[in-house]
């Protein structure tokens, strides 16, 4: 159903980066990795390699077991972060996709410490974070997120 809705959004606006990014995510979560890569590569091209497109590609490659491709995307974002801002939330996701668990945990901690809105939104329920949920350090972050007065 989500895939059909995103395809319809692309039909309505074939220049929509967001519609392609969302379709790529839906295809990834459905296990349709080849299609997801194709859609997300198009999104990356049309957006001049927007961070979200690269994160989406890293996630699909990680889920597909193509760790070297995920690692290359993580390195690209790390290089970009050395020259400008890339959120710790996005770096945590690409590190985990590249099977760099310790680095992913460090970025997740930094994302929470910085109160990165994307982490607050995605940290608990976004499927690519599930691999981190079993780590006691990530569980501690989630408990901190639930602490009274944290969001006031």
What spans do the regions from the language model cover?
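Alpha-helical protein-protein interaction modules
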Residues: 1-152
């Amino acid at each position: 159903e989500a895939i059909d809705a995103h395809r319809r959004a692309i039909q309505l606006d074939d220049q929509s980066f967001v519609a392609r990014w969302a379709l790529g995510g839906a295809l990834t979560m459905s296990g349709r990795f080849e299609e997801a890569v194709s859609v997300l590569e198009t999104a990356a091209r049309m957006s001049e390699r927007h961070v979200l497109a690269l994160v989406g590609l890293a996630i699909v490659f990680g889920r597909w077991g193509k760790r070297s491709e995920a690692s290359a995307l993580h390195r690209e974002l790390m290089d970009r972060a050395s020259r400008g801002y890339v959120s710790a939330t996005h770096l945590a996701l690409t590190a985990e996709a590249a099977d760099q668990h310790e680095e992913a945990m460090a970025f997740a901690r930094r994302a929470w410490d910085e109160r990165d809105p994307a982490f607050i939104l995605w940290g608990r329920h976004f499927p690519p974070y599930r691999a981190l949920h079993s780590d006691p350090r990530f569980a501690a972050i989630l408990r901190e997120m639930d602490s009274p007065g944290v969001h006031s």
